[in-house]
Amino acid sequence: MKRKVMRITLLGLISIGIPLTSSWGLTTLKVGALRLSSTAPVFIGMDKGFFESEGIKLEPVWFNAAQPIAVATATGDIDVGATGLTAGLYNSIGQGMKIAVVADKGREWPGYKLTALLVSTEQWKAGVRDLKDLRGKRIGITQIGSTFHYILGNLLEQKGMSLNDVKVVPLGSISSMRDTLISNQIESVFLNQPLVAAVEKGGGGNILLWVGDHLPYQIAAIFYGEKLTKNRPAAISFMKAYIRSCRYYYDHALTKKEGASYQEILDLISKHTEEKTDAIALALPYIDRNGELLTEDTQKQLDWYFKNGMLSKKMSGNEIVDLSFWKEALQQLGK
């Protein structure tokens, strides 16, 4: 009798169009992210149903800066972080927090436009055309130990300069950096896409350089909190959906600049970032097709942060990265 009732129930659900993988049958995961073009795989996976098809109900939690996402992941307020690799994240892991960096979410890469250093219209009119021209001037970042702080320090070193040669100004959030630049309250800031294109197109600032052309760098990653690392089936399911989303982005937008699927991705990014598609199309960031992490770069980051007093102790990349989830998901999906 019980089997008959179960069979009738399942048939009834099918007949009225309710999928058997409806929300009560999914694993809910909270993912913390910024509303940036480099979050495209997350947008794609949500809107195209890749996560649901792998048994994951994804709940996005939006932030205005990267470091608070690391904190939220460490405390268990979110399950997945999708943002920049910061000193705050590394310190959390160094202090015993069980966070695992597992996949790529965006690289600074030659020929691709993710992060730019911009100068105010006043500075541009005054003739600023090189980083050396900003000696003694204010450069806005989100927070001390942020990805922007790392980028600035490395770019200055390439010019034979140091962080002591400029005035580093923590402004708290990306939106604050944008607004401060547009209003000419600061000489220079870093911004990510699609804000870079929108600011330049709107006359609010001028691009001094694209970071990827000067500093190949694993700027952002997917990382798992402790609860998710202990729930391996859910962790693998998330990763499979994420890799599928990376492939869709790579095949239909990053390496293809026309057609319905290309426009679809621009529309998805526009929907979630609230920026216009024409600005987004000007510069799509590089993300590996399989979401593969540039592991050798993490050690370089750890060494730099420690050298500059932003890490509490010297650390190894092996303490940070766990590729086992990515490798297993990739094996199940096939290349």
Question: Model features per residue range: what roles?
Answer:
Residues 1-10:
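Bacterial N-terminal signal peptides that target proteins for export
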Residues 9-19:
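Bacterial N-terminal signal peptides
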Residues 20-25:
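Sec/Tat signal peptide C-region and signal peptidase I cleavage site
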Residues 26-162, 168-171, 187-193, 208-210, ...:
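Short, glycine-/small- and polar/acidic-enriched structural segments
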Residues 68-70, 88-89, 176-180, 195-196, ...:
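Short, hydrophobic alpha-helical packing/hinge segments within bilobed ligand-binding/sensory domains
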Residues 107-116, 202-227, 239-242, 322-331:
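Periplasmic-binding protein-like
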Residues 230-312:
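Secondary-structure end/capping motifs
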Residues 299-335:
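Conserved C-terminal helix/tail region of periplasmic/extracytoplasmic solute-binding proteins
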